[in-house]
Amino acid sequence: MTQNINKIYLPSPNKYLSREDFLNYTNLMREIANFDPSTKKWYINEYKISRLTKDELKGIIDQIAEYIGNSIYNILSNYIKDDNNIINAYIKGNYIYIRDNLEKYKNLLTYKIKTFDYKEGKYTEEEILLAWQKSYGFVTLRGLYWKLKNIANFDLKPFTNLRFYDIQLKNFEMRNYQINSIKSWVSDVNVIGNGIIKAPTGSGKSVIAILSALEILKNKNNAKIVYAVNSTTLLKQFQNFAKKEDLPFVLVSGEIDEIKKGERSDFIALSISYYYSKKKRNEHEKLKELVTNADLVIIDEAHHTPANIVKSLLLDSPNSIRLGLSATPIREDGKELEIMGLLGKISFTIDYTELVRNRYLVPIEYIRYIPEIPKKLKLKIQDLDDNKDPENFAKYYSSLLRSFEHSPNTNKQIISKIKQLNQYPCLVIVRRIAIAKKLAEIMRENGIIADWVSSKTKLEERMEKIEALKNEKLQVLISTSLADEGLDIPNLRLVVLLTQGKSRIKLIQRIGRVMRVSQNKRKGYILDVIYNHDLFIKQSVKKMNFIENEYNGIITIHY
């Protein structure tokens, strides 16, 4: 049988595969697909699929999903869905109630939690079923409807009936992809009440959030809206943007609580951690009333949704329409199923390549730098390796990192490399406050105008230092993980990573800091410092594989 010219390609594995896993994955793919050497991808072979029963095909798909993720169910839904059977379902608050056998959907509604066993020095997995058996069927989070519909047809009343309005902003130039993202989101909201927009740093998340708020207000004049994120810096930034469009958001956080000062509004810019801390002390009655009655809840940095502090807020707002915003809505720990359950599917993805092509972002020069190990440090590392306790990997890992971080010679090499690149303003990201202070001191001794900042720095002082970097009164600002989210410095030219590790979410957030466009800025530079030890180099290899794929076409990597 001749293949369709328009090949339907399947996603590549979403994780590193051992030799055994790779062989199993390849054998499974051969059951339903052909390999295209020109693209190095598998594409569907309808003849192979036609020879399988639905149960056989579903069994193969369940196994392949372990390697490439649940998107395969959506791609092959037409082959496995039972078109003759209509399942009754309804939405109530946070949940969707299904009158069908849970067993049929278990694979779709199960995720695996990865936890690191420090005693064994390796990851272990635990299966979590995100559904609850009932006498009439089962219940799951309403956003997971998008998973369920891949294998069944449902009789489901729409969540709402929003009309899309062609809104014009007064003070911001809207981009086509921002408008299209809201159109797609409104479409998904009408079905299930929520949706996520995958929006890289620099794509204008604040504008998208404002557009969503204005769409809701067009549909309901007296709508109540909550914009929630964990960073006071981001809250303040959003509040300032929103005021330009006559949306008077009141800021509520541990540092600034404008409600306590007597401010009143139907629009709240809320710190998620502040809400959670108030709730734990049972002091959140007024805030809970605002959250519970919200017509729209916007969750920025939505990849944090599985955290208890975010889940708690969303569960307290059961009937709200929701918008999730994140550059990284897919997590490494398997918990993206919780994100989907509470915020829905990805309604729209804003593409890096398009942003760079249209000069909304700049391309990246990624420099992988491994400082030489001085003799004294080499002896110290050897001693740590020889005497490490196999049952206490965490202590060994921490000691190893600290040895490199506190090495004067290593830090001098790093500073020399920064001076050689000569790309200012520069942001250096470190793990600990003590290192930030020390590096700032060494840099000043070496003629660099440098300062440091952390989450413990008072908001006013923090904003002053960020403004100093933005205005180029500072050459270098050294920061802890405070810089991972919400730092808006368009003219930033260099980000230096001194954190090690392989977290994809943090990496994307940090790379995003340097991709914003400004005058005379043609590229953004990343200096990724890899400490010279097998442990960190192995982490770096996995990180490089991810970066090459994520930023394909807009990144140049220097090894």
UniProtKB/Swiss-Prot annotation:
Keyword NADP: no
MF annotations from Gene Ontology: ATP binding; DNA binding; helicase activity; hydrolase activity
Keywords noted in UniProt: ATP-binding, Helicase, Hydrolase, Nucleotide-binding
Name of the protein this chain belongs to: Putative helicase 22
Gene3D superfamilies attached to this UniProt entry: P-loop containing nucleotide triphosphate hydrolases (3.40.50.300)
Start and end residues of each Helicase C-terminal domain: 410-552
Motif (DEAH box): 300-303
Enzyme Commission number(s): 3.6.4.-
PROSITE patterns (UniProt xref): HELICASE_ATP_BIND_1, HELICASE_CTER
Binding-site positions, ATP: A199, P200, T201, G202, S203, G204, K205, S206
InterPro entries noted in UniProt: ATP-dep_DNA_Helicase, Helicase/UvrB_N, Helicase_ATP-bd, Helicase_C-like, P-loop_NTPase
Keyword ATP-binding set for record: yes
Residue intervals of the Helicase ATP-binding domain: 186-347
Enzyme class of the recorded protein, top EC level: hydrolase
